[in-house]
From Swiss-Prot:
Residues 82-154, 156-237 form the RRM domain. Residues 472-490 have a biased composition (Polar residues). This is Paraspeckle component 1. The modification Phosphoserine is found at residues 409, 473, 477, 509. Residues 125-358 are annotated as: Sufficient for paraspeckles localization. Residues 283-377 form a coiled coil. RNA-binding protein required for the formation of nuclear paraspeckles. Binds to poly(A), poly(G) and poly(U) RNA homopolymers. Regulates, cooperatively with NONO and SFPQ, androgen receptor-mediated gene transcription activity in Sertoli cell line. Regulates the circadian clock by repressing the transcriptional activator activity of the CLOCK-BMAL1 heterodimer. Residues 497-514 have a biased composition (Gly residues). Residues 231-358 are annotated as: Sufficient for perinucleolar caps localization and interaction with NONO. Residues 460-523 are annotated as: Disordered. Gene3D superfamilies: 3.30.70.330, 6.10.250.1170. The modification N-acetylmethionine is found at residue 1. The gene is PSPC1.
């Protein structure tokens, strides 16, 4: 039964010779090997198979294979590794004939023919298909000329040396992808799987490979943290698969001369043995010198790595010091900015305080001026009344100065003498009654004890806390609560009722006990 899709129908031809050739060329998995053998068997023209009857179109003529089965997991298609060189082509071959020669191995992507020199190139889909086509078509007679098929030289491959042990295939491919598309990147390892420090990179075209070679040669391309640059060189191409078969040897005179004797061991003491020994000694010397050179190079590399580690440590310390100095400089600059900001704030605060103090002083000065103005307006008439009161108190009796300082006391007579200081009679401070000791009226023993302090409200009126307003009392009334040691004096002649405000001593009878508001309380 025929399968559809990416499948092709092939003819089956059992040829033991081609079967052995295919088994030696293809060492892949069992399904791939079986499919490869089936493709190889279809190389030579086979006897025409009987055509199936027309009434049975589904009868099988062979078996079908899937081209995708020849792709390895992750393998890219149509790479440089799938490119074949075909030599010894007829000069009259056409491109259609050349394609028809490889049509059984998939659709090619590149076909080039140089008819003058008799060679061409073709690129197949996978490496496995290219190996099958090479194994099948190499040596095939085409127009009486045997074809010579080899894998084409990879002109976009580079050798990478001085790799770090931590570099992998993926890292190598990622590093060189910046120059162009990479088809394959491999780090070479030994039989134990340890990295040898070498690898190769295959680009899809020559321009990216040339660019990578120039850039890495002019500069230092680092793959890891270690400052260890990679060394990039063009890859040396070797054919280690086919080698040099006998059929390709040129039969020259030197060839026939060297082939006169078969392979053998030289016998000791002979001419052959002597020079063979000298050749071996030269090879041994070359080996020793190479080992010495390798040893010197290895020691130099170790020394360089040690110096590099020390220099890296010193460099890190220098970077840390520079970073510390930079941070200190930044902190100092921030501190300066902070100090400047604080200074500005302090100046602003001082200006505010100065302005506030100036405003307070202005308010205090304004308040003082206002108080002074009020005093000048309110105390001027009261001062005249106090003067009149003091002048009137000069003609009063011994107890006349009791109510001095009262703003509502009657003013003294105009014919009296000068008033005593602050309205007090300094000559009447004795507790024993007697004649007055000097000019001026006599003052009672308690005259100065009951002096009030005039109080002036905002309206200019004078009030006395100790002499509240009340009914008028008599000026010379005797005080019944006085002690017996005091002898009340007679009221002064010629002194009538005292005129004044309602808060002065009362008018009227002088007899009886004095019950005025200035009477001392007894506790």
């Amino acid at each position: 039964m025929m399968l559809r899709g990416n499948l092709k129908q092939v003819r089956i031809e059992k040829n033991p010779a081609r079967l052995r050739a295919l088994e030696s060329a293809v060492g892949e998995s069992e399904p791939a090997a079986a499919a490869a053998m089936a493709l190889a068997l279809a190389g030579e023209p086979a006897p025409p198979a009987p055509a199936p009857p027309e009434d049975h179109p589904d009868e099988e003529m062979g078996f079908t294979i899937d081209i995708k089965s020849f792709l390895k997991p992750g393998e890219k298609t149509y790479t440089q590794r799938c490119r074949l060189f075909v030599g010894n082509l007829p000069t009259d071959i056409t491109e259609e004939d050349f394609k028809r020669l490889f049509e059984r191995y998939g659709e090619p992507s590149e076909v080039f023919i140089n008819r003058d020199r008799g060679f061409g190139f073709i690129r197949l889909e996978s490496r496995t298909l290219a190996e099958i086509a090479k194994a099948e078509l190499d040596g095939t007679i085409l127009k009486s000329r045997p074809l010579r098929i080899r894998f084409a030289t990879h002109g976009a491959a580079l050798t990478v040396k001085n790799l770090s042990p931590v570099v992998s295939n993926e890292l190598l491919e990622q590093a060189f992808s910046q120059f162009g598309p990479v088809e394959k990147a491999v780090v070479v390892v030994d039989d134990r799987g340890r990295a040898t420090g070498k690898g190769f990179v295959e680009f899809a075209a020559k321009p990216p490979a040339r660019k990578a070679l120039e850039r890495c040669g002019d500069g230092a391309f680092l793959l890891t943290t270690t400052p260890r640059p990679v060394i990039v060189e063009p890859m040396e191409q070797f054919d280690d698969e086919d080698g040099l078969p006998e059929k390709l040897m040129q039969k020259t005179q030197q060839y026939h001369k060297e082939r006169e004797q078969p392979p053998r061991f030289a016998q000791p003491g002979t001419f052959e043995f002597e020079y063979a020994s000298r050749w071996k000694a030269l090879d041994e010397m070359e080996k020793q010198q190479r080992e010495q050179v390798d040893r010197n190079i290895r020691e130099a590399k170790e020394k360089l790595e040690a110096e590099m580690e020390a220099a890296r440590h010193e460099h890190q310390l220098m970077l840390m010091r520079q970073d510390l100095m930079r941070r200190q400089e930044e902190l100092r600059r921030l501190e300066e900015l902070r100090n400047q900001e604080l200074q500005k704030r302090k100046q602003i605060q001082l200006r505010h305080e100065e302005e506030h103090r100036r405003r307070e002083e202005e308010m205090i000065r304004h308040r003082e001026q206002e108080e002074l103005r009020r005093q000048q307006e309110g105390f001027k008439p009261n001062y005249m009344e106090n003067r009149e009161q003091e002048m009137r108190m000069g003609d009063m009796g011994p107890r006349g100065a009791i109510n001095m300082g009262d703003a509502f006391s009657p003013a003294p007579a105009g014919n009296q003498g000068p008033p005593p200081m602050m309205g007090m009679n300094m000559n009447n401070r004795a507790t024993i009654p007697g004649p007055p000791m000097g000019p001026g009226p006599a003052m009672g023993p308690e005259g100065a004890a009951n002096m009030g302090t005039p109080m002036m409200p905002d309206n200019g009126a004078v009030h006395n806390d100790r002499f509240p307003q009340g009914p008028p009392s008599q000026m010379g009334s005797p005080m019944g609560s006085r002690t017996g040691s005091e002898t009340p004096q007679a009221p002064m002649s010629g002194v009538g009722p005292v005129s004044g405000g309602p808060g002065g001593f009362g008018r009227g009878s002088q007899g009886g006990n004095f019950e005025g508001p200035n009477k001392r309380r007894r506790y």
